[in-house]
């Protein structure tokens, strides 16, 4: 299977993304010789990976933007018939130790959300995976209010992590950004700060954007 060359510039990236609008996942997969899974229970990242491949994203699972040379992160977002997001959006793994001196400005969350290409995809369960169509893409940059909310949530969450209170953080914390266990396997462990300042083992956590926030982004774009 021939790899897609990364887009040279923003215009080319947007052209590629717009060309996918209205196309089904089965059509994209067939063009690439990829088998469509019956469901996404075991292939949760399949849709995102397919679209990354079609657009020529380069980051893979590396901690950087998908189109680093363009300063753009790619995010697929499953939506219902009303165009509302069906689930929270994963941003990146949260650092749980060695966080001294880490600020919002040099955080991975800030880096990833500088500029995002949102690609909505039909996500209703009654639509088979292959029949789900891709929507119109949105190139988004957080405005000052959105940035303030993101920074505020990130700083509050990181402060609790630094105080060794990671276990007390629930998905309800944060207005727009939340912290949740990341690993599919609950036996996966990573180091985190304990309340007495030592290190302890806990499940890895990830930062996620809440659906109310992503719904706001879609509403602003589509009205």
From Swiss-Prot:
CDD domains: MutH-like. GO terms for biological process: DNA modification; mismatch repair. Keywords: Cytoplasm, DNA damage, DNA repair, Endonuclease, Hydrolase, Nuclease. It is found in: Cytoplasm. Its main location: cytoplasm. GO terms for cellular component: cytoplasm. One of its GO terms (molecular function) is endonuclease activity. SMART domains: MutH. This is DNA mismatch repair protein MutH.
């Amino acid at each position: 299977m021939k790899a897609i060359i990364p887009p040279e510039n923003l215009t080319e990236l947007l052209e590629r993304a717009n060309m996918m609008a209205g196309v089904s996942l089965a059509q994209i997969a067939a063009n690439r010789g990829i088998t469509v899974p019956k469901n996404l229970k075991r292939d949760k990242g399949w849709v995102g990976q397919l679209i990354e491949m079609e657009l020529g994203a380069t980051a893979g699972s590396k901690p950087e933007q998908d189109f680093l040379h363009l300063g753009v992160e790619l995010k697929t977002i499953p939506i219902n018939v009303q165009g509302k997001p069906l689930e929270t959006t994963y941003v990146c793994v949260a650092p749980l130790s060695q966080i001294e001196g880490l600020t919002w400005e040099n955080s991975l969350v800030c880096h990833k959300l500088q500029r995002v290409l949102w690609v909505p995809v039909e996500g209703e369960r009654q639509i088979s995976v292959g029949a789900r169509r891709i929507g119109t893409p949105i190139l988004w940059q957080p405005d000052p209010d959105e940035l303030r909310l993101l920074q505020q949530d990130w700083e509050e969450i990181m402060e609790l992590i630094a105080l060794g209170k990671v276990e007390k953080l629930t998905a309800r914390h944060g207005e727009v950004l939340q912290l949740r266990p990341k690993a599919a396997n609950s036996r996966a462990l990573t180091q985190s700060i304990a309340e007495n300042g030592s290190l302890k083992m806990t499940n890895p956590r990830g930062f996620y954007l809440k659906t109310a926030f992503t719904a706001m982004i879609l509403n602003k774009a589509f009205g």
